[in-house]
Amino acid sequence: MGQSKPLRATALIVEDDALQREMICLLLEESDFEVIECESAEAAELVLERNGDSLSLMMTDVNLAGHMNGVELAHIAKKCNPELGVIVTSGKPLQQELPDGAKFWSKPWVPLDVIREAERTLVEHEDKADRRH
């Protein structure tokens, strides 16, 4: 039954904690997103270089495996796709400035917030698609 609705948007989830990543992915898949998962900012950067313009949403933790953090990744993501919805999460106060248009969510966040953001992003995605046609 999960295939009854067409996938309308793609989200990139960047989280080195496998359980957190899986939970976010499940929430977004239930909201009709196609999901790309990455454990590190470096892996996500490759996805952004190849598919950045086709993404609608990126959610990343600040502290990630590898050399780059989520805030640095957010800046790269916005350069690749200025219209991309970007959410940066952390259990600690943010020490770096986010790019324009990016949002910061303090951990722990509520799963319902992910669903609401997904729904808002889908509406924006549909509006942009309608304007192109």
Residue ranges and their predicted role:
Residues 37-57:
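Acidic, metal-coordinating helix/loop segments flanking the phosphotransfer/catalytic sites
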Residues 61-62:
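Active-site residues of response regulator receiver
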Residues 45, 71-83:
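Short amphipathic alpha-helix used as the core "switch/output" element in two-component signaling
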Residues 18-37:
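Two-component/phosphorelay signaling modules centered on CheY-like receiver
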Residues 107:
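A Lys-centered signature of the CheY-like receiver
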Residues 1-12, 18-19, 25, 54, ...:
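Non-catalytic signal-transmission and effector/linker regions of two-component phosphorelay proteins
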Residues 40, 68-73:
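Acidic catalytic/metal-coordinating carboxylates
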